Amino acid sequence: MSQLHRGMHKKPGMFPPKEVLEEVDAGSGSDTETEETVECTEEEEEQDETDGLGDLGMPPPKKTTKSAASPTVPAPALIPSLSHLIGLEGKQPSRKYAPAEWPQYFKQKISVARDNDTFNVLYTPPDDSEAPVYVFHHGAGSCAESFALLSVRLREMMHEERFQLAATAKIRDENKLPGMIAFDARGHGFTEVESTDYSLEAFTNDFAFIVANVVAEFGLTNNLILVGHSLGGAVVTNACHLKLIQHPVIGLAVLDVVEGTAIESLASMQQILNSRPKSFPTVEKGIEWTVQSHTIRNRESACVSVPPTLISQHDGPGMTWRTDLMLTKPYWKGWFTGLSEKFISCAPAKLLILAGTDRLDKDLMVGQMQGKYQLIVFQESGHFVQEDAPDKTALSLIDFWKRNDKVNKTVPLFGAFRA
């Protein structure tokens, strides 16, 4: 039997009154977080496909019609110069890249023990037994905090909606805010696992273990919605396909990963990983590089999701990547093989959110035409859709829950996104 240890930190009030959120139209562009999201030029957008450096499951870099050897048009750099970002004079970084911490986004931090392994879990309990619990799995090279901003947006928007309904006497209460479960996968963040097995099977068994133990520890009876980004999408899909979650699952949401393009991108992944800076003088410089390289476009999200992916160097000053993704290379193809077929065959309602329409493979195109899952496309988002566009992602997940939860009796206020 595993042991769960509750964190010492709790955050009591996360949802002060906010302005009424404007309805987001299906064809709208990026979120309205203009101060948090770094804008990019058309030239930079052409390189977006090579910017998802912290995760796998990306399409191959787009080809340019201009010669790299042209004396007048130099080849575009895959990564911004590290010396440019750090500054040759050693000037201090702007405080706008100051690291943020998990208590601003989750209410509890707990440890789930299994033999000699310890999993780091971030948890926010649901406010009502009828509210859903979203269970998140991050992608390769990322961490639980990749869903931090999304978690807050989900509860804020749900609170705002129920406040409006209560004000018009359409409901009797406003306490059905969703719960959140996010954790660091093996080899990532602050989770400590002895094994170096990074197969899909190992990740999937870990996921099922975490869900079972958190549900049991807190006595949750709520319906679950599984949400996975990139590699995490393959993990939650596999767990659902194998029926490893012994608790009601009403929804499966996969964020920006498609089997066909994921496997195609593997040929360029080593080049992309080798092109990343190997170290940073400070955590703030790591955040700055992540934002300026458009790996994550939302500065607020990067400030909380990047720090756990860095660790102090053993052989000198500065920070380096916590997860050595090259150690996972033997498992890359196995992560995504069969993903589309498994996703389409899963019993719960299914949602696929993509950053671009060109990423559907044949199986998914056929399944989408047959109405086997809901497809939403964020045209102006990068690979980390939950971080780049947390408002749109939250609205989509709320609408997805309301469409598929038999317990829910309210009509969504938010307009649905359409493919």
UniProtKB/Swiss-Prot annotation:
It catalyses: [phosphatase 2A protein]-C-terminal L-leucine methyl ester + H2O = [phosphatase 2A protein]-C-terminal L-leucine + methanol + H(+). Residues 32-52 have a biased composition (Acidic residues). GO terms for cellular component: mitochondrial small ribosomal subunit. InterPro entries: AB_hydrolase_1, AB_hydrolase_fold, PPase_methylesterase_euk. It comes from the Eukaryota. The keyword Hydrolase applies. Demethylates proteins that have been reversibly carboxymethylated. Demethylates the phosphatase PP2A catalytic subunit. Belongs to the AB hydrolase superfamily. This is Protein phosphatase methylesterase 1. It comes from Yarrowia lipolytica (strain CLIB 122 / E 150).
